[in-house]
């Protein structure tokens, strides 16, 4: 009986940690996207094209490694 109670509490704690980790990741991604779109909003169209090109080259080079 006691072992089952302890096991359930450990499982609940693990679930809580997992849920909190997901929430933190979602918040960080949201803040990152807000920062990116804010930066894009402050740049002109030509700057966005240059950044998109550089980002594409960076992603392609990262995948080739």
Curated annotation (Swiss-Prot):
Q: Which organism is it from?
A: Shigella sonnei (strain Ss046)
> Looking at the UniProt record for this protein, which Gene Ontology cellular component terms does it annotate, in alphabetical order?
plasma membrane
Question: In its UniProt entry, what is this protein called?
Answer: Two-component-system connector protein SafA
Topological domains, Cytoplasmic = 1-18
Q: What induces it?
A: By acid stress, via the EvgS/EvgA system.
Reply yes or no: does the keyword Transmembrane apply.
Answer: yes
> How the protein sits in the membrane?
Single-pass type II membrane protein
Could you list which ranges are Periplasmic topological domains? Answer: 40-65
Entry keywords, A to Z = Cell inner membrane, Cell membrane, Membrane, Signal-anchor, Stress response, Transmembrane, Transmembrane helix
| Pfam families for the chain | SafA (PF17073)
| Its job | Connects the signal transduction between the two-component systems EvgS/EvgA and PhoQ/PhoP, by directly interacting with PhoQ and thus activating the PhoQ/PhoP system, in response to acid stress conditions.
Q: Does the keyword Transmembrane apply?
A: yes
- What family, per the record? Belongs to the SafA family.
Assembly and interaction partners: Interacts with PhoQ.
The primary site where this protein sits is membrane
Q: Where in the cell is it found?
A: Cell inner membrane
Listed transmembrane segments: 19-39
